[in-house]
Amino acid sequence: MTHSNIVGGSSAKRLIKCPGSRKLVAELPPKPSSSYAEEGSRLHDAMHMILSHGARVDDYTDNEKLILALDALNEIDPNNELEFATEVNVHFGGFLAGVFGSCDLAGRIRNRAILLDWKFGDGVSVAAEENEQLMFY
């Protein structure tokens, strides 16, 4: 699955400040992947398989990070009331036509919306408060 079209963790701040920059970014060559990005993709895929397809945490070698993410989800939803979908494309309508990102989990508990984007703690530090990528969603 393609995780984003221009909008990602590193570009969201720029796009919020200057929506027109998306045209310039679209003309740039793709950035090479990093080992941090590749590990993050593996962990994101594992969370999707665990939550949506019943895979077992023990099946993954990086399971300590997965356990921390699942523990955080259990804090959000201790009574297992969450209705959710994983790997959800989020489109931005007329604000940024043709641009999308993906959040790792979109759901609700009664009338409360829950949007999660797993950050596994390697490479670039990411703050949850005022997080530009989540502000898009």
What are these regions (language model features)?
Residues 1-54:
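Charged, glycine-rich intrinsically disordered N-terminal tails and low-complexity linkers that flank
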Residues 6-7, 16, 28, 50, ...:
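Weak global preference for isoleucine
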Residues 31-94:
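A non-catalytic, helix-rich entry segment at domain boundaries
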Residues 80-137:
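Mg2+/Mn2+-dependent nuclease catalytic core
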Residues 7, 25, 50, 57, ...:
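Extended aliphatic helical segments
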Residues 2-5, 64-66, 116-120:
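Short, charge-rich amphipathic segments
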